[in-house]
Amino acid sequence: MARVERLPRPGETLTDAEFFTAPGGKGANQAVGAARLGARVRFVGAVGRDSFADEALSGLRESGCDLDVAEVDAPTGVAVIYVDGSGENTIVVAPGANGLVEPVEPEGAVLCQLEIPLPAVETAGSKASFFCLNAAPAKPVPVDLVRRADLVVVNRYELEALPETPRLTALTLGDEGAVLLEEGEEVARAEPPRVDAVDGTAAGDAFTACLVVSLLEGRPREEALTRACKAGALAASRPGAQPSLPTAEDVDAL
């Protein structure tokens, strides 16, 4: 990750960046986020046999996640992130080993993203007691996958890429908060608390993890959405991806 005062223009070189590496990835961030909120988490994924593998898994281990991770003959997935002074970012992902994640059929609730192969997502959601699809990054997905999901989490751009309207959608709106849509009709809305945004890299992952955990705890939809917005705001107010993810105590105190 490189922190810069402003994002570079095409062809421009900036020389005042602060650079560091940290574990991340949508799936890993959401797993760590859910674990910090008190959920028992099993993380399924893949890493390469390289120097990035241990760091990629370090946050998951520290958060107490159970790991079901294969070592494969491909580089560990990485993302190159630029974050400007206002917390806005641009991200380029080299999926590497993530593209070789094998399908599994986990029991219980399942949260998947689209940074792994679609067959793995489809299989994981096929027998889940609760299936949440975070349809990110935006890409074409089979209509059956959307129909199977109990909850689909998207931003405006990802919503446009869906083949049809999900049964239940959490639509994130950045600093405007989020809405829950049932069959396309708004049923709940929440605004985030005002914070000084530092880095929005994991804000969406914090939101998604908190929303899923809150719903699985049996909280009413509006309360779950409000807590999720708080989690996202807290993550945006801290630097880094996994280091920014809040605990349940953090969320409840805001």
Residue ranges and their predicted role:
Residues 1-44, 53-55, 197, 241:
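Glycine-rich phosphate/adenosyl-contacting loop at the front of the ribokinase-like
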